[in-house]
């Protein structure tokens, strides 16, 4: 499922700077927060939802946000796999900016000893030309964990840090989609920083048209049916 890919990641053991801003997630009035465009192909900013028949524990009922998709392969992070490890214990300088529950999320099975950070820009902010930020889609950006935090804090609603990632080589993901392992859908900015108590998998499906939305009624534990 996951394959070797070489993104720009931050090794967890190399963090040194201190974070000194406590930025809370703000109320947004951006229209794109509520309307996701139709997704017909994989590209940065799309979601991969595990289909109901994908029962492999690593990816069952996962929602993967695609960060990179190019000639080198595809990279994404699982949005709904929180760990019990506090960000403060791993990257303390980012703890105050991290949205609740302020824990590391498991981005996937590849390179679990490295970290990747996504953030949501405040409404009206642009990432173009800002050192330390790389635009992904809409208000979602990738954050360089080696950047100067003081310069980025005023622009960001919040961040989420992922240990590891999910990756595919050229053509590998296409094959998995063809055999219906994944459903390709568009993301809303709120999906990236969603609280773990929310069933993101079901939430994304429920906002789709019929018949896709009916998949949200699929039981979590099919053995109980």
Predicted features by range, described:
Residues 9-12, 16-225:
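A short aromatic-anchored loop/beta-hairpin motif
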Residues 2-10:
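Extreme N-terminal basic, low-complexity initiation segments
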